[in-house]
Each structure stands twice: as C-alpha cells, then as structure tokens.
Amino acid sequence: MAYQHCPFDTLLILDFETTSDAANQDYPCEVIQFAIVAYDVPNDKIREDISFNKYVKPVLNRTLTKNCVDFTGIPQRSIDTADTFDVVYEQFQQWLITLGLEEGKFAFVCDSRQDLWRIAQYQMKLSNIQMPAFFRQYINLYKIFTNEMDRMGPKELSATTNIGKMNEYYDLPTIGRAHDAMDDCLNIATILQRMINMGAKVTVNELLTCCASWRRQPLVYNKEWRSSFMDAGKIFERVLPLVVTTIRAGDFRLEMYGVCRYCRKGMDVCGTSHQQTPHDLYKNEEDPIHFAKIAGYY
C-alpha cells in the first residue's frame, strides 16, 4: 500500500531547533539540535534504529535565551558540550554514507518549508558550507496535509502548530515533547505513515531555486517586522538567496534532481551568490538588518 503512494524507497524526516529571541525576529538563529529518523516506504516501517540526533553548539550567541530554553527544553549544558555545526554536519554526511543511500533516490520530509528553506540555508551561510542538492528539493508534509483535508473533509482543529493540527486531524497521540527535534521527527513520521496508508500521494512538492519573478516587484512590508514572525518571513524571502518554488504532485522527476528549475544550472553553481539582491530593502531600512549583516549578505 505505502509503496504505491510514494516514489522513494526511503524518506528522511528532518527537524531543526534553533537559538531564538521571541521578541526579536531580526535574530541570527543558529541550529542547536539536528535530528532525523528514517521511514522505510516499501515495508511501511518507521525506523527508529536509523536515526541521527545531535545537539549543536552555536557560535554567535553561545548562551541560550530563556525563551529558547523554555521553548525547546534544551538545557545550556547540552549545548556547551556539543560540537559546532560544521562538525555535526560532517558527522551527518558520514551517517548518510553509512546508510548507502543514493542521491536522488531518497527525500527529506519536514512539517513546513522553514527547516530547509530558512534554517538550513541561513546556517549553511553562517558556517560557509554550500547548500547541498539533497536539501534543495523536499516534501513539505503540511502542504500535502492541507490537500488531504480538501480530499477527505475538513475538521475543526484547536491545535496551533502544524504537527499538532495533523496529529489532531488523524487522532494520533503526541509523542514526547513538542520542539524536541527527535520527538518532532517521530511525530511527523507517524503522521506521514498514516497519511500514506490513507491514500495520500507523498512526493517532493517544493524546490529551492535562485530566482522568482515576484521578487522583481517592490516589497511592501510592515516596518515593525522585527516583532512579527509572519512579517519577518517577507524579509527572509528577499534576503535569502534561494526561494521556495512549489511543484504539483507528480511533477517531480528524478532527472530534475541537482538542477535549478529556474536557471537550469547545477546546484554546485546555482545559489552560490544572490541573483536578486534586495538593494532597495537594505537602502530603505533605517536600522541595519542584523541577521543579514552578520551573515554577510550585505
């Protein structure tokens, strides 16, 4: 059943947790937990034995804010003894090699676009690591979920998070603690399994490309964006070089892997520099955009 609804043998459910300051969206968020759990599609099995879970030591702001500790549950001592992102990323790459997965034959699954488009892209810039091809096409499970609600019928949902809403819709119990990256991965994996078994077609539905036509238009935004996550998203869409492109279910093909859908160049070339630098935004902001400045975007 599961294999009929997904073209990949292996799905890697991924979640990041980051440093944060709730009162300031212009905060250079760094990864502090990096977790993955595998889902074996042909055998319809969540493979908790195939997992990756590491705490990561931030470099810019080494002391976690109270908001961050309360939100993630990650204690300062776990961060103090962890490796920095460049080391953990190398460990992750070695872990992938041990699994013997062939690029293009597996896909990452997240509960939104935030983990790979925003968090990974920004962290890679801070760590001077090129954004890998396997992070530039992924499955946004929540987007598939919204389509499934249209197909199966809506419900009144009281949850506020993507994971919470999906668990509530499918009557699934919450696993562990919200915003622990590994517990989030296990929740997403359980939701993924339920969705596939109920007939959802699960495949890559978002790509990261170097350009978008709408970014050529002047940006209209709230000048108080630093206090609003939603408003800050508009700023990130202009500052980050790679932008989300949605593709329809079934349109992703293996030959699309590793090639930017916009410029048609390989991902070892595309995205190494910003093709649509928001000069007007930088010029018009009275105060420097801190997260962009500290990462060297301008």
Curated annotation (Swiss-Prot):
One Pfam family it belongs to: RNase_T
Cofactor(s) in the UniProt record: Mg(2+)
Protein residues bound to Zn(2+): C210, C260, C263, C270
UniProt keywords, alphabetically: Apoptosis, Exonuclease, Hydrolase, Magnesium, Metal-binding, Nuclease, Zinc
Phenotype upon changing D15A: Reduces DNase activity. Abolishes DNase activity
Domain of life: Eukaryota
Subunit: Homodimer (via C-terminus). Interacts with crn-5; interaction promotes the DNase activity of crn-4. Interacts with cps-6, crn-1 and cyn-13.
GO molecular function: 3'-5' exonuclease activity; 3'-5'-RNA exonuclease activity; DNA endonuclease activity; DNA nuclease activity; metal ion binding; RNA nuclease activity; single-stranded DNA binding
CDD domains named among the record's database cross-references: ERI-1_3'hExo_like (cd06133)
Job of this protein: Possesses 3'->5' exoribonuclease activity in digestion of DNA and RNA. Cleaves nucleic acid substrates with efficiencies in the following order: single-stranded RNA (ssRNA) > double-stranded DNA (dsDNA) > single-stranded DNA (ssDNA). Involved in apoptotic DNA degradation.
GO CC annotation terms, alphabetical: cytoplasm
Source species taxonomy: Eukaryota, Metazoa, Ecdysozoa, Nematoda, Chromadorea
Positions bound to Mg(2+): D15, E17, D184
Gene3D superfamilies: Ribonuclease H-like superfamily/Ribonuclease H
Organism: Caenorhabditis elegans
Outcome following mutation: H179A: Reduces DNase activity
InterPro entries hit by this protein: 3-5_Exoribonuclease, ERI-1_3'hExo-like, Exonuclease_RNaseT/DNA_pol3, RNaseH-like_sf, RNaseH_sf
Phenotype of gene-disrupted mutants: RNAi-mediated knockdown results in accumulation of apoptotic DNA in 1.5-fold stage embryos and delayed appearance of embryonic cell corpses during development.
Protein name listed in UniProt: 3'-5' exonuclease crn-4
Limits of the Exonuclease domain: 12-192
